[in-house]
Amino acid sequence: MNNPQTGQSTGLLGNRWFYLVLAVLLMCMISGVQYSWTLYANPVKDNLGVSLAAVQTAFTLSQVIQAGSQPGGGYFVDKFGPRIPLMFGGAMVLAGWTFMGMVDSVPALYALYTLAGAGVGIVYGIAMNTANRWFPDKRGLASGFTAAGYGLGVLPFLPLISSVLKVEGVGAAFMYTGLIMGILIILIAFVIRFPGQQGAKKQIVVTDKDFNSGEMLRTPQFWVLWTAFFSVNFGGLLLVANSVPYGRSLGLAAGVLTIGVSIQNLFNGGCRPFWGFVSDKIGRYKTMSVVFGINAVVLALFPTIAALGDVAFIAMLAIAFFTWGGSYALFPSTNSDIFGTAYSARNYGFFWAAKATASIFGGGLGAAIATNFGWNTAFLITAITSFIAFALATFVIPRMGRPVKKMVKLSPEEKAVH
């Protein structure tokens, strides 16, 4: 049923909170492709008889493909709406993750993890843009709740994965979770839409504040923000991929490590609405400065304090993820603040490339550095990169102002974005 004055659906399908819930559910369904990997890494390594670095390279490749799929998928999302791209993304997650447990070679592992990663990139972009477009007045909070789904969504899966890994093995764990994730994503695709969209098609309304991807890539603001996002991701992705292997190197029990993975995901996801809300109140860049500064200090101290015992290890994981996770509420909303919403799906894909590039360190390279030079060296590198992000957010980005498109003059209030 349509509202004759607005042309919008009424009832549940016209309620923007319904679409925020769908966005969060989508994030929950793709969360495990990244955040449960640390549980799979050692069983996969043992099954294939290869090094940890070789297995973690699969994680890196998946992250890279996630970034590559977002601008391309975003083009079709911006042009036609989210439904058909979401169906394709869900099918890729289903096929890639379900069959990963059947691989008998490293190339097959890489191929299937990248297929799942490509699907994740498409789904992530759709979920985040659904939240941003339905909530232009509460963009930080909406982005935070949606990003929280990506961090927290893995939690219900962790006991299932741990149990199935012990009883039935890695193949069954991949298959059960892959089927659940893929099928639910495809079902959500039948009802999701953007505001102003009727049916499957979407019309783009472009204003002078909307930058297409080519225009955005020519602004210095994009590249400084990209560098900050790239820098702060080193430490978080190192821990995402390697918190369990690192904990084992400290001699921690398997039960402690399982609790640690749950805690890191709880704080990683739970912090995102909080930091999004804070950024709506005090500004994106001030919030970035606080988050990135604390993260740099935590990573510098991580190997010293985590070695003190079980509680210290879990506490450091919690603080590290509570700060790093905030970036996933801050950058999507900043992207829409500065470059507009008309092309936001494809534009955020270019921001996501920063995370993918940082994952090279978080996955195979980080594991190789830890193996050859020790974990202290790996954590020191991540502390330095988070400090770079802090410096950019504190001293550089706020002074740059808002980019101006096509010689359009903006008021001082418009130019001073947060």
Curated annotation (Swiss-Prot):
The listed outcome for Q66C is: Residual activity
Q: What is known of its domains?
A: The protein has a two-fold symmetry axis, with a central cavity which may be associated with substrate transport. Residues contributed from seven transmembrane helices probably line the substrate transport pathway.
Query: What function does this protein fulfil?
Result: Anion transporter that carries out the exchange of divalent oxalate with monovalent formate, the product of oxalate decarboxylation, at the plasma membrane, and in doing so catalyzes the vectorial portion of a proton-motive metabolic cycle that drives ATP synthesis.
* Name of the molecule in the record: Oxalate:formate antiporter
Source organism per entry reads Oxalobacter formigenes
An example Gene Ontology biological process: monoatomic ion transport
Q: Which NCBIfam families match?
A: 2A0111, oxa_formateAnti
Q: What is the effect of changing C271A?
A: Slight decrease in activity
What the entry lists under CDD domains is as follows: MFS_MCT_like
Q: Which UniProt keywords apply?
A: Antiport, Cell inner membrane, Cell membrane, Ion transport, Membrane, Transmembrane, Transmembrane helix, Transport
Q: Gene3D superfamilies this protein is in?
A: MFS general substrate transporter like domains (1.20.1250.20)
Additional detail: Its velocity of transport is the highest one known so far among transporters of organic molecules.
Q: How does it sit in the membrane?
A: Multi-pass membrane protein
Transmembrane stretches in the record are 17-37, 48-68, 84-104, 108-128, 141-161, 172-192, 222-242, 250-270, 288-308, 311-331, 350-370, 378-398
Subcellular localization, as worded in the UniProt entry: Cell inner membrane
The organism's place on the tree of life at top rank: Bacteria
